[in-house]
Amino acid sequence: KFHGAVVDHCGHEHTRVFAEIADLGKLLAQMDDIVGTTAPARVALVYDWENRWALEDAQGLCNVNKKYVETVMDHYSALWRRGVSMDIVDQASDFAGHDVLIAPFSYMLRGDFALRVDEFVQAGGTFVATYGTGYVDDSDLCFLGGFPGPLKKTLGLWAEEIDVLMPGMENHAQLDGARYALTDYAELVHPEGAKVLAAYEEDFYAGMPALT
């Protein structure tokens, strides 16, 4: 019985809440020019169910939780906190109208996704990939010739192997004067045209590229 209301138990409009709601109505009336308009997202973030299923079924990497969803959400959250709007797409979606395509942990490359990614990059788009990209095709068969399969040329690198970091384990890398902790996975890659931006600091792959 004591919940708030625009018109409270007093029964009249001479209250703070009523005045604020009235002011809000006046403000909304001034926004007719933007009603119905949209701001198209320039960034597309890939969340792909078939890739998720393939990862969850893979008898390798971490058998408890491979953290595909968490990896996608980490990318989403980082952009959302900076006010960047995104379209959530899957690998079969049309992403040609975007400037940036982010495809975290794309273990499975379905259909012509890799081809369309390459065309997207050739047309000036920016493609962001992570560890664990391009290991199997849409029949869940490993790509021959090295990972990330058909994206090797596009990304300008060859992934030799991937190391799983157990909970609590970290490696580190420095970028622009800041030192970052690396968790979950560490992929050993060899640049084949890609520019190395940061390198691992520890373990047997110290000095190898961590970010290109």
Language-model segments: residues:
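Carbohydrate-binding surfaces of carbohydrate-active enzymes
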Residues: 1-212
